[in-house]
Amino acid sequence: HFGRMLFETITGQDQGRILEENHEYSPKWGVSYGHTFSEGSTDPEAIKGELAIGIEMICYRMRAYGIRSSSFGGHIGFDKNDYPSIGFRFVTPSFTHITKYVYDACMRELAELIDSFCQRKMAIRSLMISTQDMDKTSQMNLFFRDEAEHTQRYQAIDRINNRYGKGTVTTARSLYRVQGNTHFLERNSG
């Protein structure tokens, strides 16, 4: 039964969700997201879409855990072993868990780099992104004055997605992504 349970968890069939009512758990080191594609991609917009998905997942988890971050890092892995993975780091002006702020800061740092890799036909095969510091307070933010409004909007989106399934409400930028059998279930049900 353990194998079936593990398969259902990996493939998302268990419909596991992070519940905001559970205040007992808080990650010690932050939250992260990683994705390896079945094939490398030189489509910069698809790579940016994959980053958007990762940032949406990280921000969703931060909101659920009641944490914020101002520093993020990760790496970009390539299809060929000729190119080593590239580490990156970006910061937001203040602690936040608002997807828009994190994505905008990420693109300021990585958009040209991704475009450059793709123009040089350096196929990107994997992405990883994580928080590097955390704030567990709910202190008002002086840099993002509209954070309360955004927080309410994202909490409503989170509730809809928790109720009706992940991806029921999503951003347009996360719809354009790397094509192929990138999900465990897709690779193993052929």
Sequence positions of predicted segments:
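DNA-contacting surface of Y-family translesion DNA polymerases
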Residues: 1-121
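Acidic, metal-coordinating catalytic segment for phosphate/diphosphate chemistry
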Residues: 86-190
